[in-house]
Amino acid sequence: FNRLPGFGDRPFDMGKHVAIIGVGDVMVDIAHWLIKYKKVERVTAIARRGPVERKYNPKEIRAVCSNMDQEGIATEFARIKDRLAAVGQNADEVLASMTAEFTKCEPTGSPSKMGFRFLASPKRVLVDANNRVRALEMEENKLEPKGEDTAAVGLKQLYEFPVDSVLFAVGDRVDETVGLPYKNGVYVTNPNKTGNDPDDSLFQAYDEKSGQIVEGVFLAGWARKASEGLVGIAKRDGDWCAEVITRY
């Protein structure tokens, strides 16, 4: 997917139906790859909450909206209609709003179909006798108000959702096991401004215990601010970090 040497050229049999867990911009990037380049039969994005809480940018969805299974999406809305109504969400209005974003769709040249499964929490990846993925075990959810937002609450109703592969596109925290100074979901950067442009401190890893920068370690893009902004913003951040490293 990301063309990483040593990994990007490995053969992976994705099968016909691929589930992507998550409904953010990373999900859209992966779906685009599966649809345009792998040409799988079906892609399903799995969401713990409902369509109102989807996180992808409407501009990003243009990359895959020409392959949306709109009939299947309407069926999915009918399935969860009562649970949306329970928190004051009108399924018909939400469906109209969501599908209205399917404009200026980019051609993919692929017969793939894409859909969504809402109010579903994956519990286990199920495999067959050959250790190949055969399904996701999922739990039905309902929505409950949480301040101005909503929270997914499990209904303890489990079911199997047949798929051939599962990809994960969730989480907005960096990996704290890397060993860099870590705090509140992000790696710590230098709080002491240097006055350069771009400012070195924004990209320098920093150890609060010693009060020193981590020599020779720089952070950029989502390693600096996890899941903030679109890919283009992360690229710009990488360009700035490259300037800082060159200066170093």
Model-derived regions, located:
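Glycine-rich beta-alpha-beta "Rossmann" dinucleotide-binding loop(s) and their flanking helix/strand
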Residues: 1-3, 37-38, 139-200
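Short FAD-binding loop at a beta-strand-to-alpha-helix junction that anchors the flavin cofactor
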Residues: 202-229
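Short, flexible hinge/linker loops that cap or flank conserved catalytic cores
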Residues: 10-13, 160, 211
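Dinucleotide-binding/catalytic capping subdomain of oxidoreductase cores
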Residues: 17, 27-161, 178, 245-246
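A conserved FAD-binding loop/helix module that cradles the flavin
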Residues: 220-245
